[in-house]
């Protein structure tokens, strides 16, 4: 391996699998074969971000050199369960997915920005992160269900979009409140509060 640009940053095998499209078992096997160093925090197996970065090289929109030091630090915090960092990572991949929602060349297998966005946004939403809920609503409204592509049924996507936007509004997300009011004008005024 050459000099590592992010020498002490590591992520879980599961997050490595999500980002690269390689299975957790593949990452375990690469560790067993000595191809990737196994790091640990005492609780879970971790791999250096550089190993994940090398596995992502050549993937449009997610190329290894597209990661700034700040992006990697946010990724590490998201992997550790920080809701705001999960929402930030999810929103970055959601933007990639939404830009690619129009008919275009499909992403390489396993490197689907929509699927990665759902992974991080769902974890942040489980922690009541309103921005993550809103982003999930936007993904579903664009026809991008958890598979990350437009193959899901439109009715299901529309229902999920409405549900996530309503949840974001209930958690105080200002834009989601306005969207919900525009969709359902006969609703009583939604209370302000929560997080925006």
Predicted segment positions?
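Short helix-capping/linker turns of helical repeat alpha-solenoids
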Residues: 34, 80-83, 96-100, 127-130, ...
